[in-house]
Regions:
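Short cytosolic juxtamembrane segments of multi-pass membrane proteins
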Residues: 3-7, 179-193, 566-570, 657-662
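Hydrophobic alpha-helical transmembrane segments of multi-pass inner-membrane transport and secretion
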Residues: 18-44, 54-90, 110-124, 204-208, ...
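Short helix-loop junctions at transmembrane helix boundaries
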Residues: 39-53, 122-154, 212-228, 599-662
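Basic-flanked hydrophobic alpha-helices used for secretion and membrane insertion
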Residues: 313, 320-325, 331-551
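Short amphipathic alpha-helical coupling elements at transmembrane boundaries
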Residues: 11, 15, 84-94, 187-188, ...
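N-terminal Sec/SRP start-transfer signal
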Residues: 1-31, 195-200, 209, 244-293, ...
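Hydrophobic alpha-helical segments
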Residues: 112-256
């Protein structure tokens, strides 16, 4: 009997090839992408790249997500195949095959299927390994090299990972067969889904969950809070989506059914009845499509925005070729430090700037009345932050004259409470706003770390910086010095001396010999190399994660159409016999498919719209400061996804119609 199962295993794969083709394609892509991620993560060449540790850590995270997503996709595809083969397995049982024989047969099927698909996936991954590595180098703006990257341990690791996944499939298949008799197996596919319970309660809980998730996304004020609440909001939205699809669609269809004018139309009656019949299955499938579609949109929008913003972000943190910041030092020290380093290396200084400024955080705010944190006070969540510059430094940065005296100040404000106001109060000191600036005047002159931490930052320009400080002896206001220079050396030359510059700063610190006095700095070209590695890696991961999520989306849609086509075929045959013509059948099919498969897309766009504010704040920490660019990128990704979704819909609905009209 067990010899018979060997023959049956092979013949079943051939006979059910229409079910196994998309399953094989999903496994093939999952294995290929997983192999490529593992190969890049363990590639010793990446460790040699400037910033290689960061990119390997980023790829490691992507590797984990890809593995998890691949496992879920393979599990879903296997579940669909087994559900659609349940009648076949039941008939085998009725013909005399025992459960152990059925388990043995399905085990052998998966062994053959797994060897072919996993082997092919590893082969394709190894074939494109060099090309993908070169693509990653290109994204990281490094010299592209086609070098051998084959690693035996990567092949073994992928085999172990997918071996465990397929062992899980074998266990689940055996469990399915063991808990059902032959009659139950033969009827499993044809049995309708159970009507959901507590639908009003589910609808209320789903609405509340989705509402709270949207509220968190819309009301978050700063990037740090956005990071901490992001996953909570995501879980709430996912939970709410599943509940609303499960209960909301049922309630909606029941309302349509009660509307006699609408329901008792041939096309409407058939569509609504079919959806109600398979309510639970439709709900889970549709919610899954909505969530996967949202993942594609968010991942690609974020990754593309990060990649496009890399150049502007570099200049925000590194406005000069060589920069140095210090505390408790003098402007003359920084000026001398930069000049000496340039002289030692034989560089000609094209431009050099040295500034002193202060910064402070606001503990409480009532309109234009602000209270600065006191020294030693815990500054967990400031209301807003200020950078304060001397009038002379403002004039040097902008080339524009500014006449301030007494308590007059110039103001650049992002905080809504002080923007476009004539005066503001800091502690008990009132200042008159003589001039408000609309342009961020420190760009290309002084690095602004607050730009990436909060959207709520401000600049003050005062007549005399020291006189301003003397008014707040007990407040936590911090002195900062910055110096920067641009030189006539090429980027390649500057990159060679990047480590020397770091050592030069360390040597300078050792000479200070005073506690609390120190300097730190970086070179633009070195920071750019590390940022390019990070941003290019993130974009690379975003592309491949989007591919995985898209494969999952297509798989769910395709299998859903195929399974519903087989389930609907017999009912449409009956309807044809009672007088429904081909035109009415086509109209009914189109209405049902349109209703079912464009609802998830609508939810995906809705989720993205509500998540956009929170996403933009999170991306700001990573360096996406150009909001206009991000909006254009997001809308472009949505347009591309819409086109892809419509194409998928057209292809899968054609398969559905062919099955129904057979």
């Amino acid at each position: 009997m067990f010899r018979l199962t060997n023959k049956l295993a092979v013949s079943n794969l051939i006979k059910n090839r229409k079910l196994y083709y998309p399953f094989a394609l999903a496994v093939l892509l999952a294995v290929t992408v997983t192999y490529l991620f593992y190969s890049l993560t363990f590639n010793p060449k990446i460790a040699e790249i400037r910033g290689g540790t960061t990119i390997q850590a980023t790829l490691g995270f992507g590797m984990f997500v890809v593995t998890l997503a691949s496992a879920i996709i393979v599990l879903y595809a296997n579940s669909f195949v087994m559900k659609n083969r349940s009648k076949e397995l039941g008939i085998y049982g009725m013909l005399g095959l025992e459960k152990r024989h059925l388990i043995s047969m399905t085990f052998k099927e998966l062994v053959v299927f797994g060897i072919l698909t996993v082997g092919a996936g590893i082969g394709i991954g190894a074939l494109f390994d060099k090309l993908i590595f070169a693509f990653l180098l290109k994204l990281m703006k490094l010299k592209v090299e086609l070098v051998a990257t084959f690693q035996t341990k990567v092949v073994i690791t992928v085999l172990v990972v997918f071996g465990l996944i397929f062992l899980g499939l074998m266990f689940l298949n055996a469990l399915r067969i063991a808990r059902m008799n032959a009659l139950q197996l033969s009827r499993e596919k044809a049995s309708g889904e159970k009507k959901g319970r507590f639908l009003p309660l589910q609808t209320i809980l789903g609405s509340i969950s989705l509402g709270i998730g949207y509220y968190l996304a819309l009301t978050v004020k700063d990037p740090l809070t956005a990071l901490t609440t992001f996953f909570i909001a995501v879980l709430l939205v996912i939970f709410g989506t599943y509940l609303l699809f499960n209960a909301g669609i049922t309630v909606f269809l029941q309302i349509l059914k009660k509307n006699k004018k609408y329901y008792y139309q041939p096309n409407n009656l058939i569509s609504v009845s079919n959806l109600i019949f398979r309510m639970k299955k439709n709900a889970v499938g549709l919610a899954t499509i909505a969530i996967l579609s949202t993942m594609v949109l968010v991942t690609m929008s974020a990754a593309t925005s990060i990649f496009n913003s890399s150049e502007s972000f570099k200049k925000v943190l590194n406005p000069h070729d060589f920069g140095v910041s210090g505390q408790n030092v003098e402007k003359e020290d920084l000026d001398k430090l930069l000049s000496q380093f340039a002289s030692d290396k034989g560089y000609k200084i094209k431009e050099k700037e040295v500034f002193r400024y202060t910064y402070f955080a606001v503990a409480n705010q009532e309109g234009t009345k602000l209270t600065i944190f006191e020294k030693g006070q815990n500054r967990v969540q400031p209301k807003t932050v200020f950078m304060v510059f001397d009038q002379k430094d403002y004039e040097n940065m902008t080339g524009q004259k500014l006449s301030l005296s007494g308590n007059e100040v110039g103001l650049f404000a992002k905080n809504e409470g002080v923007k476009e106001q004539k005066a503001l109060t800091l502690n008990d000191h009132q200042f008159s706003v003589k001039e408000e600036f609309t342009k961020d005047f420190i760009v290309n002159h002084v690095p602004n770390q607050f730009n990436i931490l909060t959207a709520d930052y401000n600049y003050l320009v005062v007549p005399d910086l020291q006189a301003f400080l003397d008014q707040f002896p007990d407040s936590a206001i911090y002195n900062q010095f910055y110096g920067g220079m641009n030189v006539n050396a090429s980027e390649a030359e500057q990159l060679k001396v990047a480590e020397e510059y770091e050592k030069y700063l360390q040597k300078f610190n050792a000479q200070l010999n005073t506690e609390g006095n120190y300097v730190y700095g970086s070179t633009l070209v070195d920071a750019s190399a590390q940022m390019s590695a990070l941003f290019g890696g993130v974009f690379f991961i975003g592309i491949f994660l989007s591919i995985i999520f898209m494969v999952g989306t297509v798989l769910v849609i395709y299998y859903k159409q195929i399974s519903e086509g087989y389930e609907d075929r017999e009912r449409f045959i009956i309807l044809q016999k009672v007088g429904l013509d081909q035109k009415q059948i086509k109209q009914t099919i189109n209405k049902q498919v349109l209703t079912v498969f464009f609802l998830p897309l609508l939810f995906a766009f809705l989720h993205l719209a509500f998540a956009y504010h929170m996403l933009s704040l999170i991306l700001k920490v990573i360096g996406v400061l150009d909001t206009t660019m991000m909006l254009i990128v997001t809308l472009s990704i949505c347009a591309i996804f819409l086109i892809a979704y419509v194409l998928i819909f057209m292809i899968t609905s054609r398969s559905y119609r062919k099955i129904v009209q057979m």
